[in-house]
Amino acid sequence: MGRFIFMSFGLLVVAASLRGTGADCLSGWSSYEGHCYKAFEKYKTWEDAERVCTEQAKGAHLVSIESSGEADFVAQLVTQNMKRLDFYIWIGLRVQGKVKQCNSEWSDGSSVSYENWIEAESKTCLGLEKETDFRKWVNIYCGQQNPFVCEA
């Protein structure tokens, strides 16, 4: 009997270790390639959404999308976890200054290495648009209140 309990415990430890980085995420968060994500149905301005993200977990910010795979993951997270799908979802990027160019950094400080624009405008903040199944970026007025996705 003792041997059975020891073996069962050993298998449990192995199974838990094989689950990967998902075990490192807070409850209610989802993992993708070593990062944790959570979709929030709270309606906030871009700045307020960023503040909420930083209060949720250590190192958290509005999501920074760095690949098409991550874009697909975030789109799926939004559609599966939000009851009411509005037109836009905040992401952690905004235009800085008067030039119609994207700032070279996400709100978490990482460089922009992947872009997926619908079209570039100068409304200063960016979000994902429902019409593109939340896969394309669109400029939105920063004072508009939208749901958002945090990444830690």
Curated annotation (Swiss-Prot):
Disulfide bonds join C25-C36, C53-C150, C125-C142. Residues 1-23 form the signal peptide. Its main location: secreted. Expressed by the venom gland. Keywords: Blood coagulation cascade inhibiting toxin, Calcium, Disulfide bond, Hemostasis impairing toxin, Metal-binding, Secreted, Signal, Toxin. Belongs to the snaclec family. Calcium is required for ligand binding. This is Snaclec coagulation factor IX/factor X-binding protein subunit A. It comes from Protobothrops flavoviridis.
